[in-house]
Regions:
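Active-site acidic/histidine proton-transfer and metal-coordination neighborhood
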Residues: 1-81, 90-92, 168, 190
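Histidine-acidic metal/acid-base catalytic patches
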Residues: 12, 64-79, 83, 89-190
Length: 190
């Protein structure tokens, strides 16, 4: 990760995201995960970048309570949260309520929709903003009301090996961007 921080600072990237590691509900490995993320956050601080981690289905940090716990235990100002509503939704939570609870440390946001609460976000075309079950207008509105002005990163996964062409990926991206722009306008952020 040190090389990633060095490269980030050299090319002007202020935020480096990583996964939390560990497994959900595994208290035995929680201290190791927190120590590792804490050490990485201190290293990021040394380089003048922010390390962000997101709640991820199946990982040690996977929902709002575990995100809040990590926020409490990792005190470095270089530690931030990358929020992805699809993981919070699949953890059985309301992403609008979740973002409001952790907004103080949110430094990066992935935006992806999903249908259902399965372990997967679903087929790529169902991840396009507005096609799934997530209240993205409410989510982006909560970000705006909370004062968030950082990056919103559109994300679609699972296209490899499923026959999704480059052109289809571009259509999904364009649809998602258009929906996100409409959400930003609806909540007064644009």
């Amino acid at each position: 990760m040190e090389q990633a921080f060095q490269a980030a600072i050299e090319i002007g990237i202020p935020i480096v995201n990583c996964g939390p590691g560990g497994k959900s509900e595994d208290e035995a490995t929680w201290p190791k995960v927190i120590d590792s993320l804490g050490n990485l956050a201190h290293m990021a601080e040394k380089y003048g970048v922010t390390l962000c981690v997101k709640a991820h289905v199946g990982a040690s940090i996977y929902n709002t309570p575990t995100t809040l716990r990590a926020m409490k235990e990792i005190t470095s100002p270089a530690f931030g949260i990358d929020m992805d509503p699809s993981h919070i939704h699949r953890a059985g939570e309301n992403p609008v309520e979740a973002i409001s609870a952790v907004i103080a440390r949110v430094k990066h946001v992935h935006i992806r929709d999903c249908k259902g609460r399965g372990p997967s976000p679903g087929e790529p075309y169902m991840q396009a903003n507005g096609r799934g079950d997530i209240d993205l207008v409410g989510y982006i509105g909560a970000l705006h009301e909370g004062g968030y002005d950082g990056p919103l990163d559109l994300e679609i996964i699972g296209t490899k090996g499923k026959g999704t062409s480059f052109e289809q990926c571009c259509v999904i991206a364009a649809e998602s961007r258009g929906h996100m722009q409409a959400c930003l306008q609806a909540c007064g952020a644009r």
